[in-house]
């Protein structure tokens, strides 16, 4: 079975790793020396590549972290 994280770039995996620490987008900016818009783009890419679509009953950030932890 293919690891869903294989679709992520190295930088997207770094962003996801900081998300897994429970950090906000602002904290990700500060840790990785990125602009807020860049972090938003990486987070969006993570959600898209992990096939996490917006849904009223789903917290995509939590689902992304769960995928990271299971890998």
Predicted regions and their residues:
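C-terminal edge and immediately downstream basic/flexible tail or linker adjoining helix-turn-helix-like DNA-binding
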Residues: 56-71
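Short helix-capping/turn signature of helix-turn-helix
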Residues: 20-23, 70
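Recognition helix of helix-turn-helix DNA-binding domains
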Residues: 24-60
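Regulatory hinge/linker segments at domain boundaries
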Residues: 1-18
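Hydrophobic residues on short alpha-helical segments
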Residues: 13-20, 47, 65
């Amino acid at each position: 079975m293919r690891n869903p994280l294989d679709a992520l770039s190295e930088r997207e995996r770094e962003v996801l790793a900081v998300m897994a620490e429970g950090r906000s987008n602002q904290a990700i900016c500060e840790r990785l020396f990125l602009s807020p818009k860049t972090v938003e783009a990486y987070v969006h890419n993570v959600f898209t590549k992990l096939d996490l679509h917006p849904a009223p009953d789903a917290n995509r950030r939590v689902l992304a972290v769960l995928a990271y932890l299971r890998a």
